[in-house]
A protein has these predicted regions:
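Glycoside hydrolase catalytic-domain context in secreted enzymes
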Residues: 1-289, 298, 305-306, 315-530
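A short beta-loop-beta micro-motif enriched in histidine and acidic residues
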Residues: 295
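Residues that scaffold the ATP/ADP-binding catalytic core of kinase and kinase-like folds
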Residues: 312
Length: 530
């Protein structure tokens, strides 16, 4: 199983790409931590594959100094908690570790630095602009080639400007820079959102593209202070996570609907470990029952007239809480939202809706020729350090369900995710489906070009999309049923499409699937043995 399934990609990286460093993983392999595994790190990686670069651990995955040093590890990341000079000196003095082992590690590190020019070249080439046009082009090409067209009923796509005159874009994902969390989360110099890209290409073709918020945020009901005529929230920004001391800055925010992944834009506030307090006066124009929605990543609290009605002051992935109350027209209500950002994703979203007030959204969807619904995952729901659910995040499932229920206008779904999601509940209602993955800073431009036919979608699925999570070949061994913290890969070589071939289960979309805007004829085909 190792040689046939798991090793080939790593072996190719070592022998064909000539990588300079390799990282060991967190898990046990046949009962031994991979960071301490002499057969894996020495016999296979060094002796069989010929790797002579730096072998480092993943962050915090080194458990003991001596077995890691003897097993072949060169560098413990991040801080050398286990394999450090003091610990190594102790085992050398005891005679458990030979100095030649240390020399070998130093050699691996130095020869790699020399090979890559780190010892004799400047590491900053100032002739390359930070916002490099060549990099922008590469990012755009990758986004164009990576998106996969999965469904296209009656050739709705590409959108034809002689028939399609008005397009509605819905979903918060259309406005955000989208990326997975953890190490995959980077801050681009600039980015083009899905909405910006669709609107720009549409304008070139004389098509009106507008964004429709699935929620009526009722922004006209909120004012920065008592007696003020200025709409918005008075924001106080603190460079700590507990709102202590004086704010480093104050400003008026028109609404609270932020993805601060690229920073708040407030000088003195970084991308982590800060807090914000927003205050405003709410003056509802109509009597009725209202629902307050507050969510984010990390902690958040809501006060109405100094009463704490939502309290989730905890780190964690994006989630939402609601509070319902009756409001009276002409009465004023003091609103206060508190938020803190630790590390990772930085999302805060606050809005309120009048119960049953969906008329505007429904009318807007039915006043266009096509609806582009952008939904899926982002850095708040899909990251390292934990597996996401197969189901969509609740707010994303709510969005696509709401769109489907409110309109008969053709719907094209654009999904951002690093893998498959549950789609049995909504896929049949969509006329088109484009899997965007996480397309990077130029994803919006690429999406607009593909939707309007300037670019032919050519991406193919690199994995099989199952219909149900229970259909996946790994399902039966995924859960730690006996709570011993060990998982046996019982599927063996029957992972991915091999597993579906073996089980005979019907899949949603097979490995290698992907539609385009043209047709192909194959002739005079021959097959030769491998």
């Amino acid at each position: 199983t190792l040689n046939e399934i798991y090793f080939p990609a790593f072996k190719a990286a070592v022998q064909e790409a000539k990588v300079g460093s390799v990282m060991s993983s967190y898990n046990l392999l046949n009962g031994t931590w991979t960071t301490h595994h002499p057969w894996l790190l020495r016999t296979v990686l060094r002796d069989q594959w010929g790797f002579d670069g730096i072998l480092m651990s993943d962050w915090g995955s080194t458990h003991y100094c001596l077995p890691a040093a003897q097993g072949g590890l060169d560098l413990e990341m991040a801080g050398g908690e286990k394999m450090n000079p003091d610990s190594l000196r102790y085992f050398i003095n005891r005679g458990d570790l030979d100095m030649n082992v240390i020399d070998e590690k130093v050699q691996h590190i130095l020869q790699t630095m020399i090979k890559f020019g780190f010892m004799d070249n400047e590491q900053l080439d100032s002739s390359i602009p930070e916002d490099n046009p060549a990099s922008v082009k590469t990012a755009l090409d990758v986004a164009r080639e990576g998106m996969v067209l999965l469904k296209n009923e009656e050739n709705l796509l590409p959108l034809k400007a002689d028939k399609i005159k008005k397009v509605a874009v819905v979903g918060q994902n259309a406005l955000r820079y989208l990326t997975g969390g953890g190490s995959g989360r980077v801050t681009p110099i600039h980015y083009v959102s899905f909405y910006e890209g669709i609107k720009a290409v549409g304008a070139q073709k004389g098509v009106e593209v507008k964004y429709i918020d699935e929620y009526d945020h009722l922004d006209d009901d909120v004012y920065v202070a008592s007696g003020s005529d200025e709409h918005g929230f008075n924001g106080e920004y603190f460079n700590n996570t507990d709102l202590s001391g004086a704010p480093i800055a104050t400003k008026v925010d028109a609404n609270i609907n932020f993805n601060f992944q690229n920073g708040t834009g407030v000088e003195g506030i970084g991308t982590s470990n800060y807090s914000v307090r927003w205050t405003a006066e709410l003056r509802p124009m109509e009597d009725g029952e209202y629902v307050f929605h507050l969510g984010g990543d990390d902690g958040f609290r809501l006060y109405i007239d100094d009463k704490k009605v939502i309290d989730d002051w905890n780190p964690g992935q994006e989630r939402y809480k609601t509070y319902e109350m009756r409001l009276s027209a002409g009465k004023t209500y003091a609103v206060k939202i508190e938020y803190y950002q630790g590390t990772g994703a930085a999302i805060i979203d606050f809005y309120w809706t009048k119960v049953g007030a969906d008329d505007y959204f429904q009318a807007s969807l039915n006043d266009v020729d096509v609806v582009i619904a952008c939904f899926g995952h982002d850095s708040g729901s899909e990251a390292e350090g934990g597996d996401r659910t197969f189901a969509l995040p609740s707010k994303q499932k709510e969005l696509i369900t709401k769109v489907i229920s409110k309109t008969t206008t053709p719907i094209v779904g654009v999904v951002t995710a690093g893998g498959n999601v549950e789609m049995q509940s909504w896929i049949r209602h969509l006329d088109g489906l484009l899997w965007a993955w996480y397309p990077g800073q130029e994803g919006g431009t690429a999406l607009g070009e593909i939707l309007f036919g300037d670019i032919n979608p050519s991406g193919k699925l690199p994995v099989t999309f199952e219909k149900r999570w229970a259909d996946n070949p790994t399902y039966n061994s995924y859960y730690d049923s006996d709570n011993d913290k060990h998982v046996e890969f019982t599927e063996g070589i029957f992972m991915g499409y091999r597993g579906y071939d073996k089980s005979g289960k019907t899949v949603q979309y097979p490995f290698g699937y992907g539609l385009s805007y043209t047709t192909f004829n194959l002739s005079q085909m021959t097959v030769e043995p491998a």
